[in-house]
Amino acid sequence: KQKIYFPVDGTVYFEPNQQLYGSIQPKRNPVLDQYDFFRDWPKYNKDLRLKAWTVCTHNSPQGLEHPELCVRNAFGDPYIYNLCPANDEVQHYVRALCQDLASIESVECITLETPGYLPFWHGYHHEFGFVPLDFQAQALLALCFSADTKRKAISFGVHADSLQNWVVGRLNQFFASGVY
């Protein structure tokens, strides 16, 4: 039996009910072929409560598979590590993930990691930063301008296109300045 285990990014560690999900289907972790942690919990841990933890929008494998559902910066670049929380399909996925976990009898509560937008510096799991970014550049690069985010921002009276143009201008000014 394997003694050392390396987690598989973007997978779930329980048997998902695929019917709960929409276009984003959870990826089942291969460790489930050997051991179902959630199913076997009551058998081995009779007096211990189980608190589940799940990652919501920080999911590079899902982002690679669904780049149209990712956060986009002011330049239109997708952040494949961050599914856009304003997208209806992403919201459906997160709700289904929580519902699926909550349906497991041994689960007492669920802790959600990254239920929303990520800061730019959190980023990809193996990012390299060759250009030192000041706080303002990092904050501006973290803003999402996906079609879904812009549509929802506009519905709240935000001038999303003007804001996006301003952000692009500020970032271009930063990158052209040579101050980094």
Label every model-predicted segment:
Residues 1-9, 100-109:
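Catalytic domains of carbohydrate-active enzymes, especially glycoside hydrolases
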Residues 2-5, 33-75, 109-118, 155, ...:
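Glycine-rich, aromatic-flanked loop segments that form ligand/cofactor-binding clefts
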Residues 55-105, 130-132, 139-151:
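Active-site-adjacent "subsite" loops/lids of carbohydrate-active enzymes
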Residues 122-124:
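Outer-membrane beta-barrel and related beta-rich outer-membrane complex signature
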Residues 137-180:
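Extended, charge-rich helix/loop segments that form flexible
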Residues 127:
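Short metal-coordination and nucleic-acid-contact micro-motifs, chiefly zinc-binding Cys/His arrays
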Residues 1-33:
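Aromatic-lined carbohydrate-binding/catalytic grooves of carbohydrate-active enzymes
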Residues 28-40, 91-95, 180:
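Well-ordered, non-membrane alpha-helical segments in soluble/globular domains
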